């Protein structure tokens, strides 16, 4: 609902003040409510001012220290000071233009001393400087500056494209570093695993051979004790032949073996046969001697 008034009286709504004149001269500030005026005494309501907070967006184009053209968007929130409403009513005809002019002046004095990166980092300082300057100037005209926000900093499109490319290149470089470190760690862990596997495999082979050696020793001793007249070498030869045939049998039973290299010459077969025959004859001879 707006303010309504006539020559004899008027109603001033909440968050507003009226400027009352007498014979064309300022007399007093009228608070919200219903007021009566005496036109015969030259009293009348000259105008009404709102004390609500108003917002003004200002766009400023300027250049940074590193020769980059940017556009800054400032949002200024201001209001009329109730106690100084007469100054706001009489002193300034267009407060928005006055505010814009001072914002332009301050921003264009500060930004050329900053690089683009510094401007992004210190935009709060720029807003603070604008606020301090406006408070000093506009306070004399009955206006209070509530807040100033540096809403946006918009570089030239070509500069933005270059900044995005630089950012992308830096991220790719960082990603390659992380990837290299990950591959390095993976290779180190793989090498450690292989070394550990070889170590454990060696330990297993050593234990296996130790067990075989212990078993052969025990077999030789048992055979020598039970069969008189046999030497340890003869028992060892017999065991080796037995293991030879066991190995051939295992190779033949395995489905995964495709090629087996065996001694195939007549001499090798004869040697094996002689060893078996001699072993059996010696065993039989020792048995007869024991019977006699």
UniProtKB/Swiss-Prot annotation:
UniProt cross-references to Gene3D superfamilies, sorted A to Z: Band 7 domain (3.30.479.30)
Lipidation annotated as N-myristoyl glycine: which positions? Answer: 2
Mainly localized where? membrane
What does the annotation say about its assembly with partners? Answer: Self-interacts and forms heteromers. Interacts with NB-LRR class of R proteins before R proteins (e.g. RPS2 or RPM1) are activated by the effectors.
Q: How does it sit in the membrane?
A: Lipid-anchor
One Pfam family, short name: Band_7
Sorted alphabetically, the Gene Ontology cellular component annotations on this record are: Golgi apparatus; plant-type vacuole; plasma membrane; plasmodesma; plastid; vacuole
Asked if the record carries the keyword Nucleotidyltransferase, the reply is: no
What is the recorded name of this protein? Hypersensitive-induced response protein 4
User: Which key words are in the record?
Assistant: Cell membrane, Lipoprotein, Membrane, Myristate
Where in or outside the cell? Cell membrane
